[in-house]
């Protein structure tokens, strides 16, 4: 059997064993995708015992490509909602994540001094305990720059391998323990997150109000200050028994009923200056109007602002709201359309059909993947991650690496949406498939590399001590911050799990958190919110610790 065939066969075996382990559940809790790591350790042990040798270069390429696929698809998924989330809750989430990094560094320093753990070993334990491969590489590089013998530098890799599996378990255990301590109902948490999903802080709502302010009588909608901006859309007007689609020039009169779409605070202000909310229905049933959801798939309208399409003037159709990657937005005229945007249209059937033709509304296109933007995004992400950042006083340049670069680039491209006819929308099913493939490849290789010497180090060496130290570095910061976040900040459980996973830059933990409620994007969003800053901190922390410990002896 050729080397390639052998490697692929071993990887397939690891995936089968690992996914089987991950599907085994105890009281509803399982390792999920994290089981692949243990499958790799098991298979790696027997591969080593059998004397088989796999190409280290090939394994390294597969491992890094798997990681790139995973973080890139995560970024594309959460990109559209990432920056809105950052404005609303990003500061709080990042503060908690930074606190986890700081506490982890303090625990590492205390263990190093108390138990006189060799510097390469403690840095490897730290990197494995926080499940951060770039931290391992950064630590090894700084040790080489400081003149540490190669045999000592290699110890960092072994201690990393010992701490890494239990680092993942520690994160999963912390999530499970916090769920038990606070008696969390995951379904309730998902509903609460969905009800509080925001765009600049508020969920989009609709109300019907009656024009009661005499100062608004016989005014055009565009002359009413609260209605002439982009914060509120007036999508329907009912006068006596006639329902119509209003335009900015439509004159409103006392007694008219207006159907308004906007954020709660803005709608409240509208009531103050126009009139009170009423229970009267402004349904289109039984009228010559209808409401329909249409998806943007026509490449010719991508990047164009809603106001520039002149749907009201040309077709007498109003866009009442816009859904982008699950985030509800007020359809203001300045919003540029992206592929996959879902628009609520109000108008006559023939007019809506005409607008749908302009927008595309080709459902089959939503199932197609444009591969060119995928590889452009991955390539740009790798380039971004390879840019060295020179910090005064550091003997080695800092980099985002193959994990941070593609993630940040994907977040940016996901937010931009499209450039010309290139669009970075990815069907959810395709995104999930690439994401799962990437994480399976990554964990399979990590497990295989750890499996050969894992048992010997565990039984005959200092492996148990290293695991214990790693468990402390993993658990103490996570449990401390998890309790603080839940008790003091009243943080949503799913959001907290994503933050904990992101603070450890741990894809398997994110996969586990996502599986707690597959239809909620809370964990992925908070993960991506803290990941960029934490990745940078995780890369420089072992370098800071190395320089600190080296200088004080």
UniProtKB/Swiss-Prot annotation:
Membrane topology field: Multi-pass membrane protein
What sections of the protein cross the membrane? 4-24, 28-48, 65-85, 95-115, 158-178, 371-391, 393-413, 439-459, 464-484, 493-513, 533-553
What positions does the domain RCK C-terminal occupy? 191-276, 279-361
BP terms from Gene Ontology: potassium ion transport
Quick one: where is this thing mainly located? Answer: membrane
- Name the GO cellular-component terms: plasma membrane
Q: Which UniProt keywords apply?
A: Cell membrane, Membrane, Repeat, Transmembrane, Transmembrane helix, Transport
Does the record's keyword annotation contain Cell wall biogenesis/degradation?
no
Put simply, this protein is called Putative transport protein YidE
Q: What is the lineage of its organism?
A: Bacteria, Pseudomonadati, Pseudomonadota, Gammaproteobacteria, Enterobacterales
Gene name tied to this protein: yidE
């Amino acid at each position: 059997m050729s080397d390639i065939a052998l490697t692929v066969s071993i990887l397939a075996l690891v995936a089968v064993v690992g996914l089987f382990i991950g599907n085994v559940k105890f009281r509803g809790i399982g390792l999920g995708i994290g089981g692949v790591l243990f499958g790799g350790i098991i298979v790696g042990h027997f591969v080593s015992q059998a004397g088989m040798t796999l190409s280290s270069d090939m394994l390294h390429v597969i491992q890094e490509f798997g990681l790139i696929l995973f973080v890139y698809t995560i970024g594309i998924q959460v990109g559209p909602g990432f920056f809105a989330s950052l404005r609303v809750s990003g500061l709080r989430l990042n503060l908690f994540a930074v606190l986890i990094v700081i506490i982890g560094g303090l625990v590492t320093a205390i263990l190093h001094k108390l138990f006189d753990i060799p510097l390469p070993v403690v840095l490897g334990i730290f990197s494995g305990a926080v499940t951060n491969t770039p931290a391992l590489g950064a630590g090894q590089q700084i040790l080489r720059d400081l003149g540490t013998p190669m045999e000592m530098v290699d110890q960092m890799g072994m201690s990393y391998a010992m701490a890494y599996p239990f680092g993942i378990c520690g994160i999963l255990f912390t999530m499970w323990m916090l769920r038990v301590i606070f008696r969390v109902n995951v379904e309730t948490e998902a509903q609460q997150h969905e009800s509080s999903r925001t765009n600049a802080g508020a969920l989009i709502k609709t109300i019907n109000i009656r024009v009661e302010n005499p100062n608004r009588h016989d005014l055009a909608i565009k002359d009413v200050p609260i209605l002439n901006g982009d914060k509120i859309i007036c999508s329907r007007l009912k006068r006596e028994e006639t329902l119509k689609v209003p335009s900015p020039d439509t004159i409103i009169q006392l007694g008219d009923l207006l159907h308004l779409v906007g954020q709660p605070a803005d709608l409240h202000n509208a009531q103050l200056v126009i009139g009170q909310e009423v229970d009267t229905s402004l349904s289109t049933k039984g009228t010559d109007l209808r409401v329909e959801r249409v998806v943007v798939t026509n490449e010719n309208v991508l990047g164009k602002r809603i106001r520039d399409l002149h749907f009201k003037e040309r077709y007498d159709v109003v866009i009442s709201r816009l859904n982008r990657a699950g985030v509800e937005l007020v359809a203001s005229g300045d919003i540029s359309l992206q592929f996959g945007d879902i628009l609520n249209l109000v108008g006559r059937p023939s007019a809506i059909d005409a607008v749908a033709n302009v927008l595309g509304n080709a459902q089959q296109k939503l199932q197609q993947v444009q591969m060119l933007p995928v590889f452009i995004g991955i390539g740009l992400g790798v380039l971004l991650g390879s840019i060295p950042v020179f910090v005064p006083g550091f003997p080695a340049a800092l980099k985002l690496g193959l994990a941070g670069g593609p993630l940040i680039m994907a977040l940016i491209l996901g937010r931009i949406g499209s450039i010309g006819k290139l669009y970075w929308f990815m069907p959810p099913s395709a995104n999930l498939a690439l994401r799962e493939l990437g994480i399976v490849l990554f964990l399979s290789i990590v497990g295989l590399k750890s499996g050969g010497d894992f048992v010997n180090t565990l039984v005959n060496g200092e492996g148990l001590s290293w695991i214990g130290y790693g468990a402390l570095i993993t658990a103490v910061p996570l449990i401390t911050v998890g309790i603080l976040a839940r008790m003091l900040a009243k943080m949503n459980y799913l959001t907290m799990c994503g933050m904990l996973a992101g603070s450890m830059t741990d894809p398997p933990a994110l996969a586990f958190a996502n599986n707690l409620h597959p239809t909620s994007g809370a964990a992925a969003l908070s993960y991506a919110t803290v990941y960029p800053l934490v990745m940078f901190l995780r890369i420089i922390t072992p370098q800071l610790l190395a320089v600190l410990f080296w200088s004080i002896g």
